[in-house]
């Protein structure tokens, strides 16, 4: 099981995003666990997974970027980055984590502030099963 998805649309410029992150391009989806239109990953097998998010905070904004990772409808942790100066470039934001999922568990990403993406610098969400459990 492995997936990689990219969000290249809808965040051009200085965009405040509040809501579930969806992904317009799914490059690989072996195991059919990821749905780009909803942004939800549903574990096809129980096991240990390596998950990753990367993106960029919006430029020229003195604020922060915060991505919440939800498991089965409950927030389990936050990915946060502060942009403390009006910079022409946003900050790169990335995080990789390892977690145990049971078959059917659902993960999604939620944003409550500024993000930036376009075709050359997409937001990405990916995951892979690294150990199967019975």
Predicted regions and their residues:
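Extracellular jelly-roll beta-sandwich "head" domains, especially the C-terminal globular C1q domain
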Residues: 1-134
């Amino acid at each position: 099981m492995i997936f990689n998805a990219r969000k290249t649309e809808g965040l051009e410029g200085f965009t405040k995003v509040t809501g579930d992150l969806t992904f317009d391009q799914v490059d690989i989806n072996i195991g059919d666990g990821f749905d780009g239109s909803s942004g939800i990953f549903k574990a096809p097998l129980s096991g240990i997974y390596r998950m990753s998010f990367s993106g960029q905070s919006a430029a020229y904004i003195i604020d922060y970027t915060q991505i919440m990772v939800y498991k089965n409808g409950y927030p389990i942790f936050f990915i946060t980055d502060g942009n403390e100066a009006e910079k022409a470039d946003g900050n790169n934001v990335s995080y990789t984590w390892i977690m145990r999922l049971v078959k059917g568990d659902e993960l999604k990403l939620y944003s409550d502030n500024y993000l930036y993406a376009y075709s050359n610098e997409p937001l990405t969400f990916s995951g892979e099963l690294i150990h199967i459990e019975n």
